[in-house]
Amino acid sequence: AHVAMLLGAAAVLSRVRDRLPGTVVFIFQPSEETPPGGALAMINEGVLDAPKVDAIFGLHVFPGEVGRLDYRAGPIMAS
């Protein structure tokens, strides 16, 4: 589901890219549920450097109430 959601967001945002200020980067993290995960390796290889990333929005599939979206600022789960 993670990959499908990010690909869906990429498809939608690509249709309105001329109305989006700045650059949007879609990052697919390998091994995000398996320790040690892939985030640190990606950071060490420069995924946040070119283009420079100013903000990240993450998404995770989590069982909950149908039709409800939970969110918060700052670190959560493995972030």
Can you annotate each of these PLM segments?
Residues 1, 7, 13, 19-79:
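Histidine/acidic-residue-rich, glycine-tolerant segments that coordinate divalent metal ions
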